[in-house]
Amino acid sequence: DGIIAVQGERTSYSAVIAVPGADRIFLHDPGCNDTFTFADIDQKKLEDAVLFHFGYPPIMKKMYERGGEELEIMMKYMKEHGIATSMDAVDADSEAGRADWEAILKRVLPYVDFFVPSVEELCFMLDRPRYESWQKRADGGDPVEFLDPETDVRPLAERCIALGAKMVLIKCGAPGLYYKTADTGQRGALAAITGIDP
């Protein structure tokens, strides 16, 4: 009932290969993801929504083109209609990896309540030289094994909060998760929307 069918478009698919000691590998055909826009969403179906999760905007071409304008429009709409929002992040090796993600996040994070990137994705988006130094330091291994939460992860979380995210949950592989929240004033409306005290 909630699946959008578009005449002449093919279905997208993704397969994720997780190899120990390496970042995940994605096999992906974007299909109709390349043409998906906010206009494709039936807004009537959003009337009772409490949370809108948008997973992997980088595999949806229209979401990162024009500096993330379409993504901003969609997330802003959700916030204006009292819907809590969450979003995943970017695949560094994709076409989307060449987009200016820091500029896109600057536009979009003010409308995102829960931002859930991996530490590598986030570092790639906000600090590419640091990301490259992590890759070099890991020397073919898993970079997250060498990260220090205070000096490597915390600054990224703080940057996301400064850009407007209300809560940031950074996935750090086997070492675990790093969670940072904005101050209570910025998160205040979220409890009323979701019924949870963040």
How would you label these PLM feature ranges?
Residues 2-198:
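Ribokinase/PfkB-type carbohydrate-kinase core domain
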